[in-house]
Amino acid sequence: MGLLLLILASAVLGSFLTLLAQFLLLYRRQPEPRADEAARAGDGFRYLKPVPGLPLREYLYGGGAEELAACSSEAGASSTPTPDSPAPPTLETCYFLNATILFLFRELRDTALARRWVTKKIKVEFEELLQTKTAGRLLEGLSLRDVFLGDTVPFIKTIRLVRPVVASGTGEPDDPDGDALPATCPEELAFEAEVEYNGGFHLAIDVDLVFGKSAYLFVKLSRVVGRLRFVLTRVPFTHWFFSFVEDPLIDFEVRSQFEGRPMPQLTSIIVNQLKKIIKRKHTLPSYKIRFKPFFPYQALQGFEEDEELIHIQQWALTEGRLKVTLLECSRLFIFGSYDRETNVHCTLELSSGVWEEKQRSSIKTVELIKGNLQSVGLTLRLVQSTDGYAGHVIIETVAPNSPAAMADLQRGDRLIAIGGVKITSTLQVLKLIKQAGDRVLVYYQRPAGQSSQDSLGQLEESFLSSSCQAAYEEDAAGLSADTENRDLDSEFEDLASDVRVQTELKEETQPLSHSPKRTPTTLSIKPLGAISPVLNRKLISGIHPPPQKLPSKEGNKPSTLKTSETTEAAQVSKPQGPTFKPPVPPRPQGRVPLPPTDTSAQADPEAPEKPDKVLLPPPPADKPAEKQVKSVDQGEDVAAGKQSSAKQEGVKDLPSESSAPTKDSSDDPQMWESSEVLYRNKVGKWSRTRASCVFDIEACHRYLNIALWCRDPFKLGGLICLGHVSLKLEEVALGCLATSNMEYLTKFRLEPPTPKAMVTRTALRNLSMQKGFNDKFCFGDITIHFKYLKEGEPDHHIVPNVEKEKELHLVEEVSTLPKEEHFVGQMSLSENKHSFQDTQFQNPTWCDYCKKKVWTKAASQCMFCAYVCHKKCQEKCLAETPLCGATERRIDRTLKNLRLEGQDPLLGLPPRVEIEANKSVNKTTGLTRHIINTSSRLLNLRQVSKTRLSEPGTDLVEPSPKHTPNTSDNEGSDTEVCGSNSPSKRGNSAGIKLMRKEGGLDDSVFIAVKEIGRDLYRGLPTEERIQKLEFMLDKLQNEIDQELEHNNSLVREEKETNDTRKKSVLSAALAKSGERLQALTLLMIHYRAGIEDIETLENLSLDQHSKKMNKYADDTEEDLDSEISQLIDSQPFSNISDDLFGPSESV
């Protein structure tokens, strides 16, 4: 009985276990894919990077937690493996590789292709040899008589993987199984192999010597034994190379003849020279960068402008609706480094020509309310063109709280027309304003990125620097005049008649008000693609009704955008909050958008040949016109909130949680701008729902121009181009036609942007010394998906709510900076501890901790948040506020000079105290100071650290405060306000005092250097003098950058070495480097004094202008002509060359 019960229980248990196993196998749920993967799979395509399997990952990354930790720590220090890296215990044999190479060699050795390749390489070496100094003097020519490739190939005995293997920082999660191994493919692979060769490769050369002599040389490679390094890498661009780790053992068989007679005496000389060549070119650290045969796509691409287009019947191959989806960008070169973290965005443009970066500016209109005043507060200057064309008038200064200042006219604005009359001279401006009534309509041009904050807090930006696209551009043409005034003059030929029409309509449509009204103006007469549409927005957005609610950044000043895009006077004259995107000019194009009530919504494509009229913003329409560019951004920031009115600073973007699909705010059907994404770990990824747009391509379109941008962290509203690429639409169309689903996905290498002057490419310095380096490959790549939509096919895929919520959550996690802080352009969101560096400042600087002035201009500055403090305040600052608020600090730094409401002086009566206070802070410094400060922040320029300058037991001699001169450029004491027994004074002032003692320099040296520098080039005209001084300052800045890099490398070597003798050598080298840095600093002060001398003269002239404007404000209108003549006689720029600049005029 018991046996039966046991059998029954076993049967029941077996049945239960069988059913349970079947249930688990058949009904278990599959793991859910990630939100972005599911969305792309639902849309018909998936983009996943190749990843190694677990066995390969164990081989690459070690397979153990301890070894992995060691690899990760070493990977952070250096991306290039060194020969001292730890090796796995076992070595690999490569019999399969040797057999494969031998088989391929046997099949290819005697082919014409292989022999042509070998002879071509040999001839290249001959050409390089003839170009050398020594050989070039003796050799007339080299010719190859015979070459034999040998009967075998190099034999690889053993090979090992060099550790550490650096994983790609793509942000992808690790394996969910819990293995502590990177899931991504390596960024760099390096192998070391023991190689032996005795194949008998030889070649015979005929040599033509000078004086008609000839010689014969036979060289045979008998034996080679050595250790070879083979590297595959993606940094900074994809390439490979091989080189010997150390000097190999090489045996040569050499025979030489001179005029038919043997010359055995030359054998040893030739062998030694061949070994030196191998050591110099093919032994680490020297190598040749190679692309073929693994990466042939890295070759440069050209554009053929005259090629014929492909047509199918009467339609061009490219015509249709093209959906473009941005996937990711990687390896971007940002501010001289590949490891920066910042926000990037992309612009796409359809054009008939390749991408070209040009000056961006906006044409604006303002209504100037003159009232009963006889002066509007403007000082003008006529800038003559160097190419023979008529000059143009620019605004030199704007009096505070004057009618011009209330109308938001700024220094550097170019006046185009007044009251419908084109401006050609300053006298014409004076006459037109005098003849006008209480109100006058002014057309002016302003560079992109220049805002009202620049006029209040950054008056040092002159009109010369505003012609540059960013603070790092070096444009010599901008020093004399606007380089594009020929094109601008042609744009305004028909302006006069159009302005009068606009004035009449404006009076009917706009209510009467005492506030100045501003209306953006769009001019479109240039051919398609004449100007690059970098972040362009149409200034006319009346075609589409604006959103109903736009939250304001300042709660007490709600902003209501009208269709005519006018702003009230309070918003014009008061400093507004910074914009999320800077206003930029419209894209001149052939087809002009018209109001939706018009039957002809688009003009003929050939319209560029006809001058277009100035367009007026139409009244609000019932329905928006159908756009040709549609954004399929679900959950994207509502771009319609980014209206391009002249005063959009008070407007925020709508919340990104909007669930309905929105359309891009740009009215340009050929332009689209993506949302910003965080770029870190050498990669930036777009979400599918935030990076798709649809273009309607027509026959006139030939290229899709793509550009990547980031914000300039040192200039409000500034943008820096990181790279661009122009794609032929025919190639895209052919790629889509290759598959039936009409999709095409590929990666494009970015072309370099316009060269920047002061960006030192530190990350590329070592690599650029190698043969085969091309800096055009160093600007990263972008991966894009294309799809031609069929007729009737929807332009976007409806994502389920669950997947959308997951994706929005994923986007929030990777998200970038708060929207209020985007304009600051900080490099990282995370709060870091202060990282202070000793910095030499050029501008008057105040301590952010004790709020007192840094008299020596040498203080400590945080690398992340630009926090400045005295060296004596550094310890207190770290104790109280160890974390740096990068966002708050930069906002405060940017806005600290803005005046608050109610603090402006009365009209025409600026107090003397305010002028004197602003003179010390907001001195007109021109381009030089801004470039120097920017370069200093980027490269963290600092003096020699205390630890390298001081030795134990050195006595410090404190100078008496009475010997400290009253100057801002000398090396005075930072601690004059403290007592002589102050511990902060004794401890933290040691660096400067010790440098002064060791270098043998005191205050008199700095004073003498500065005083002598004030007389530099004084006999030259002002512009020529500025150019010479700035050239020398740029040259010195580059020298300081290089010396600092050399100094830092010596410090690292000194810390790493344990050899006492080597340490002493490095200490001596550090001392010499410190002396050189000190000498370069003195030279910088020397030449900087010349610039300050020019600024002092200009400030004195501006003071005279202010006095005269106050005087003229009380005079009558009948005396205006005589006052103008007096002002011309006493204008402060009479020493400037008359062929470039005319006299300044005050209005």
Swiss-Prot record:
GO CC terms, sorted: endoplasmic reticulum membrane; mitochondria-associated endoplasmic reticulum membrane contact site; mitochondrion
SUPFAM superfamilies, sorted: Cysteine-rich domain, PDZ domain-like
Compartments it resides in: Endoplasmic reticulum membrane
Keywords, ordered alphabetically: Coiled coil, Endoplasmic reticulum, Lipid transport, Lipid-binding, Membrane, Metal-binding, Phosphoprotein, Transmembrane, Transmembrane helix, Transport, Zinc, Zinc-finger
Ranges for domain SMP-LTD: 87-293
PROSITE patterns: PDZ, SMP, ZF_DAG_PE_2
Positions of post-translational Phosphoserine modification: 490, 515, 532, 960, 973
Phenotype when the gene is knocked out: Null animals show poor overall growth and reduced total brain volume, although the relative volume of certain regions is increased. Mutant mice demonstrate impaired hippocampal-dependent spatial memory, increased spontaneous repetitive stereotypic motor movements and decreased anxiety-like behavior compared to controls.
Single GO MF annotation: lipid binding
Stretches assigned to the PDZ domain: 365-448
Biased composition (Pro residues): 580-596
The keyword Zinc appears for this protein: yes
Region of interest called Disordered, as start-end residue ranges on this chain: 504-673, 948-990, 1126-1147
Comp. bias (Polar residues): 510-524, 557-576, 978-987, 1126-1137
Membrane topology designation: Single-pass membrane protein
Signal sequence region: none
Subunit annotation: Interacts with MSN.
Purpose: Molecular tethering protein that connects endoplasmic reticulum and mitochondria membranes. PDZD8-dependent endoplasmic reticulum-mitochondria membrane tethering is essential for endoplasmic reticulum-mitochondria Ca(2+) transfer. In neurons, involved in the regulation of dendritic Ca(2+) dynamics by regulating mitochondrial Ca(2+) uptake in neurons.
Domain free text: The SMP-LTD domain is a barrel-like domain that binds phospholipids.
Protein name: PDZ domain-containing protein 8
Species per Swiss-Prot/TrEMBL record: Mus musculus
